[in-house]
């Protein structure tokens, strides 16, 4: 190994609707906690996804990872599942999981991690709005 660690980023966008709701709670408690995000008719976001992959540069290719391969992986595992979908109704991943930005980021991480070579480290940054975003995993 050449010990030249580097990080590459791939940015993608997808649009999805969702509703934040805990079925164990009363309607009043859901509204108090989730506010407008608890709208029974759902609401949507134009998500910005940044996938960060780190590792060592391959001395044969000069790449960390071929970005076309990473792009195809994101399309297959994330965009095809979630783009222009109602996350609560149209996806298996959120049938029983509240589709908060935090949970969406963890699900995306798990989907990509399962298909990404173990030699790479992975981090997901998901923007729900221009000012609100989450990152997973995080260091303690």
Segments the model singles out, each with a brief description of its role:
Residues 1-140:
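Charge-rich, low-complexity N-terminal segments
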């Amino acid at each position: 190994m050449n010990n030249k660690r580097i990080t590459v980023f791939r940015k993608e966008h997808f649009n999805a609707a969702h509703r934040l709701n805990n079925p164990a709670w009363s309607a009043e408690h859901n509204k108090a906690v989730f506010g407008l995000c608890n709208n029974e008719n759902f609401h949507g976001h134009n998500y910005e996804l940044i996938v960060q992959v780190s590792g060592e540069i391959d001395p044969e290719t000069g790449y960390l990872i071929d970005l076309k391969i990473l792009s195809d992986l994101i399309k297959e595992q994330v965009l095809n599942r979630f783009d222009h979908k109602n996350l609560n109704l149209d996806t298996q991943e959120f049938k029983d999981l509240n589709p908060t930005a935090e949970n969406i980021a963890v699900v995306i991480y798990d989907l990509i991690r399962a298909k990404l070579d173990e030699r790479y480290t992975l981090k997901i940054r998901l923007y729900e709005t221009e000012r609100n975003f989450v990152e997973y995993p995080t260091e303690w």
